[in-house]
Regions:
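A short acidic, Gly/Pro-enriched loop at the edge of an enzyme's catalytic core
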Residues: 104-111
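Core SAM-dependent methyltransferase catalytic element
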Residues: 205-225
Length: 225
């Protein structure tokens, strides 16, 4: 899909996005916790790519109350929801932009992303990783908590069947599942191994996958000092 089509998908589902997400991410508490735990406690400048409605942003604020957060998203309706959550906080900057096109904030202690980058084609992921590396301070880190693809077609099918079983067990309705599958038209998920290789190729050090449950993973890399 084009950027405009992508924006339309997320604008259309913004109102129900948060309600649905908790039932559509098996093990969501461990997934988000793993991402938060990787960020150094003294991080003072954190940028979030694809902040959406601010669901992960509010967790960042709770974990890092003194840090300045820059929340970046290209969906105006999603960012409006984030402002409702965090709009009174003077240490939060809301940026309506496409993070794959426009410059990222510089000298960040950490750049994080949650369930966003998997919408990009592989080459755009690789280009973005280079931009992220340049935007970090030496020693800064990038954390990507994302929806990933299986390493082969057989495991991808297993992932999908497990996801359907898990979300139904969590109480997701068939409408919520249908809406999620509609959003997944936008997905361009990539396997963990490929993404870790691209991070190393971009120049990141200490690259690893720190959490994985089926098709959800948390990956991290550090800009060398």
């Amino acid at each position: 899909m084009s950027t405009n089509q992508s924006r339309t998908v997320f604008d259309a589902t913004a109102a129900t996005y948060d309600r649905d997400r908790m039932k559509l991410i098996p093990g969501h508490e461990a997934f988000y916790a793993a991402a938060l735990e990787l960020i150094p406690t003294d991080a003072m400048s954190i940028a979030e790519l694809g902040a959406g409605s601010g669901l992960f942003s509010i967790m960042l604020r709770a974990a890092f109350p003194e840090a300045h957060l820059t929340l970046i998203d290209f969906s105006e309706k999603m960012l409006e929801l984030a402002k409702e959550r965090l709009g009174d906080d003077s240490r939060v900057t809301f940026t309506l932009t496409d993070y794959t096109i426009d410059p990222l904030p510089r000298n960040c202690d950490a750049i994080v992303s949650s369930l966003s980058i998997h919408h990009l084609e592989d080459e755009r992921k690789r280009t973005l990783l280079r931009s992220i590396l340049e935007a970090l301070k030496p020693g800064g880190l990038f954390v990507n908590a994302d929806h990933i693809a299986g390493p082969n077609a057989e495991l991808e099918e297993v992932y999908q069947l497990r996801w359907l079983a898990d979300v139904r067990a969590l109480g997701a309705t068939e409408q919520q599942i249908s809406d999620s599958l509609y959003r997944q038209q936008e997905d361009r998920r990539s396997p963990v191994a490929a993404q870790l290789a691209w991070m190393r190729e971009a120049g990141f050090a200490d690259v690893d996958c720190w959490y994985k449950y089926s098709s959800f993973a948390v990956m991290c890399g550090v800009r060398p000092r």
